[in-house]
């Protein structure tokens, strides 16, 4: 059964969503992210993808106090991302209650540090964030496109011990127009044992079912929940 992971993105301490990663297209959904997290937990959700969008832009962790509050007031298993660029950032994230962290930009900009994280904390705690636009990896809050192509990028980090990958097609993110199922199928075809988590574009239960059929291990859902395209009670069938 596909694992359901709900997302909370943070800007200035508030729960927001962007469209295609554009900071100018920001919509605030709740002044208190903890309130959102508690509601998720009330409906049986166990996994939370918490994104520090301020941190992603600033290149260092910013909203760790929000992480701390959610971790101390819920039992959600939190994976944290955004602005993790140094050992001290990682230490703050884990000390604040994250069970896992996702590294994307760091894997491109400073692979040596990211390799050390994998070796030190293990592949169960360190996830690879493979965020792409037109099959090219994008970094720094998706504001910068690189020349790294998605498939070789994932393949390289699999060799270094990564087992779990969150793959976001930026063009789909926040659009509520369906996911990049074909891209995910291609990744799975190349590497059948990868724990692949889809992110971006989920708009309805059908999208989740299609991802499950394609062999995805997990799916991150954001705007579809906030815009009530998917009701939290509908997710119970996946035994979150």
From Swiss-Prot:
Gene3D superfamilies: Aldolase class I. One of its GO terms (biological process) is L-histidine biosynthetic process. Disulfide bonds: none annotated. InterPro entries: Aldolase_TIM (IPR013785), His_biosynth (IPR006062), HisA_bact_arch (IPR006063), Isoase_HisA-like (IPR044524), Isoase_HisA-like_bact (IPR023016), RibuloseP-bd_barrel (IPR011060). One of its GO terms (molecular function) is 1-(5-phosphoribosyl)-5-[(5-phosphoribosylamino)methylideneamino]imidazole-4-carboxamide isomerase activity. Its EC number is 5.3.1.16. Its main location: cytoplasm. Pathway: Amino-acid biosynthesis; L-histidine biosynthesis; L-histidine from 5-phospho-alpha-D-ribose 1-diphosphate: step 4/9. Keywords: Amino-acid biosynthesis, Cytoplasm, Histidine biosynthesis, Isomerase. SUPFAM superfamilies: Ribulose-phoshate binding barrel. The active site is at residues 9, 131. It catalyses: 1-(5-phospho-beta-D-ribosyl)-5-[(5-phospho-beta-D-ribosylamino)methylideneamino]imidazole-4-carboxamide = 5-[(5-phospho-1-deoxy-D-ribulos-1-ylimino)methylamino]-1-(5-phospho-beta-D-ribosyl)imidazole-4-carboxamide. It is found in: Cytoplasm. It is an enzyme of class 5 (isomerase). CDD domains: HisA. GO terms for cellular component: cytoplasm. Belongs to the HisA/HisF family. This is 1-(5-phosphoribosyl)-5-[(5-phosphoribosylamino)methylideneamino] imidazole-4-carboxamide isomerase. It comes from Azobacteroides pseudotrichonymphae genomovar. CFP2. The lineage of its organism: Bacteria, Pseudomonadati, Bacteroidota, Bacteroidia, Bacteroidales.
